[in-house]
Amino acid sequence: MKEFLAVGEIINTHGIKGEVKVYPLTDDMKRFKKLKEVFIDGEGRKILSCKLQPNNVVLKIEGIDSIEEANKYRKKLLEIKRENSVKLPKGSYFIADLIECRVIDENGREIGQISDVIKTGSNDVYEVKGKSEVLVPAIKDIVTNIDIENKTVTIKPLEIWQCE
């Protein structure tokens, strides 16, 4: 499992004093208010202030003190150490842990690897790339087992639930 988890991406500067606008990669934007430190390219930096906006977060990060300096961080991911992440309820997983999991059906047939997790509102959908691309609804009726430690997701055979 990855040591760091991405919680946001710097998408723009904000103001002239080095604040950055962050697109959250988490379901709970309010968690940014509790963060004391983030990692950018593996380097830990303190969060000095946080302002929540409707769809973004504005952060003042230690060591970024001008608009010119902030501009250098566009498109950079903000990460946290796994041990500082939110505790997930049983049966929930971090997207970073699902990506690249091998997907097999209950008969042991290889389907492919999870390349993306799509948020649909009602349930997530796993994008699985193999011989062809398959979209797998992340629901208990289809996904029968998730083994993060062994990077394996087991699903019911495609012919049972997939329409031709």
UniProtKB/Swiss-Prot annotation:
It comes from the Bacteria. InterPro entries: PRC_barrel-like_sf (IPR011033), PRC_RimM (IPR056792), RimM (IPR011961), RimM_N (IPR002676), RimM_N_sf (IPR036976), Transl_B-barrel_sf (IPR009000). Residues 90-161 form the PRC barrel domain. Pfam families: PRC_RimM, RimM. One of its GO terms (biological process) is rRNA processing. Keywords: Chaperone, Cytoplasm, Ribosome biogenesis, rRNA processing. One of its GO terms (molecular function) is ribosome binding. SUPFAM superfamilies: PRC-barrel domain (SSF50346), Translation proteins (SSF50447). Belongs to the RimM family. NCBIfam families: 16S_RimM (TIGR02273). An accessory protein needed during the final step in the assembly of 30S ribosomal subunit, possibly for assembly of the head region. Essential for efficient processing of 16S rRNA. May be needed both before and after RbfA during the maturation of 16S rRNA. It has affinity for free ribosomal 30S subunits but not for 70S ribosomes. The PRC barrel domain binds ribosomal protein uS19. Binds ribosomal protein uS19. This is Ribosome maturation factor RimM. It comes from Clostridium botulinum (strain Langeland / NCTC 10281 / Type F). The lineage of its organism: Bacteria, Bacillati, Bacillota, Clostridia, Eubacteriales. The gene is rimM.
